[in-house]
Amino acid sequence: MTVYHFVGIKGTGMSSLAQILHDMKHTVQGSDYEKRFFTQTALEKRGISILPFDKNNIKEGQVIIAGNAFPDTHEEIVAAKELNIPVHRYHHFLGDLMNQYTSVAVTGAHGKTSTTGLLAHVMQGAHPTSYLIGDGTGHGVENSKYFVFEACEYRRHFLSYYPDYAIMTNIDFDHPDYFADINDVFNAFQEMALQVKKGIIACGDDEELQKVQAKVPVIFYGFGEDNDFQARNIQKRTDGTIFDVFVRNTYYDTFKITGYGDHSVLNALAVIALCHYENVDVEAVKHQLTTFEGVKRRFNEKPMGEQVIIDDYAHHPTEINATIEAARQKHPEREVVAVFQPHTFSRTEKFLDEFAESLSKADQVYLCDIFGSARENKGELTIEDLQKRIDGAELITDTTTDVLKKHKNGVLIFMGAGDIQKFEAAYVKEVQVAEK
């Protein structure tokens, strides 16, 4: 019996892949740091073993899949090589796996996870679909027709993939610790485009994506009239969004989605265009769009007393703009309060003014200390450099969250890609203790 062992199984992509293989009746286990991570819940529900890192975890006959964050000097990877066991890097293994299906890669600087989740949900309503989402969610179906997966541009990892289709949501400068500038990012996407085998669904409102060249048809979607798929007559409501879709200037149908903000309309348009291209029944698409409940850490909302708490992964100025816009659409009468934890010193330094501008669209801003990545845990920059650029911004720690109580009718948006959930949990606990 082959055992698939994941080195770093709690990583979001790794966790998703482990779930897929388990669902396909393979034996799966993995190792990681003992600190609890949100991806553990889905692994534990499936009974997948999570071990502490130990070279003795590695045994002959296993298939070793290693997360991209772990170097070749990691004790388990060294142990595998000593036993002459091949070590498959996550993105290479995924690239081989998807070749068994009609594969759809979802990529872009922003909106990847939400669009992947939405596409997987919609496709499942019509055909057996396996999927891998960057929020740590994965699902495998043995007789799948489609394989939908999130493909990340960071360090050009998506160049390991040769998908049938690619949805490209946008090109924007991010990951300044790796990419030199917007041209470097564009070149990565251009290279990816040349690896797609059947067709590309790209946002035509994005100036960078308009320049992409490909060997396959490129279908553009967006709000502009030049797009192949265009959203018109948009009704932004507190219970979602309704819009008409025109295909090459001819009315196609009217759709309702559960999401808020322009970015949610664009994500849905991408899914509608892909499904149209694959002849998925439009009634199935319409129904599935109305039943989508979202993905983890993307505008996840819960009421707490008179307040509303939103948990969101937004960690780039463009994403912060979108999240605040969505909150204002759904809760037009409420005060919008942003609680933001910058993620990585390099990103914070590069986009300092842009962060200040986007956060200033909230009514009140609270800033947590900068969360350094594993590759860079210190920098000369401090959170005060961002604070002084935002009028009225206050600093907050996980022991001073009680200050948020004064926003009695507020929408509290906890945003960040680090451990911002620690601050949210501290505040929830603070409120619960006060209520006793």
Curated annotation (Swiss-Prot):
Q: Which Pfam families match?
A: Mur_ligase (PF01225), Mur_ligase_C (PF02875), Mur_ligase_M (PF08245)
Reaction catalysed by this enzyme? UDP-N-acetyl-alpha-D-muramate + L-alanine + ATP = UDP-N-acetyl-alpha-D-muramoyl-L-alanine + ADP + phosphate + H(+)
Q: In which pathway does it act?
A: Cell wall biogenesis; peptidoglycan biosynthesis
Q: Which UniProt keywords apply?
A: ATP-binding, Cell cycle, Cell division, Cell shape, Cell wall biogenesis/degradation, Cytoplasm, Ligase, Nucleotide-binding, Peptidoglycan synthesis
What would be an example GO MF term here?
UDP-N-acetylmuramate-L-alanine ligase activity
Intracellular or extracellular location(s): Cytoplasm
Q: Where does ATP bind?
A: G108, A109, H110, G111, K112, T113, S114
A GO cellular-component term linked to this record: cytoplasm
Q: Which GO terms describe its biological process?
A: cell division; cell wall organization; peptidoglycan biosynthetic process; regulation of cell shape
UniProt feature coiled coil, ranges: none
Which Enzyme Commission numbers does its entry carry?
6.3.2.8
Q: Matching InterPro entries, A to Z?
A: Mur-like_cat_sf (IPR036565), Mur_ligase_C (IPR004101), Mur_ligase_C_dom_sf (IPR036615), Mur_ligase_cen (IPR013221), Mur_ligase_N (IPR000713), MurCDEF_pg_biosynth (IPR050061), UDP-N-AcMur_Ala_ligase_MurC (IPR005758)
HAMAP family for the chain: MurC (MF_00046)
Q: Which family does it belong to?
A: Belongs to the MurCDEF family.
Biological function: Cell wall formation.
Under which name does UniProt file this protein?
UDP-N-acetylmuramate--L-alanine ligase
What is the species of this protein?
Bacillus mycoides (strain KBAB4) (Bacillus weihenstephanensis)
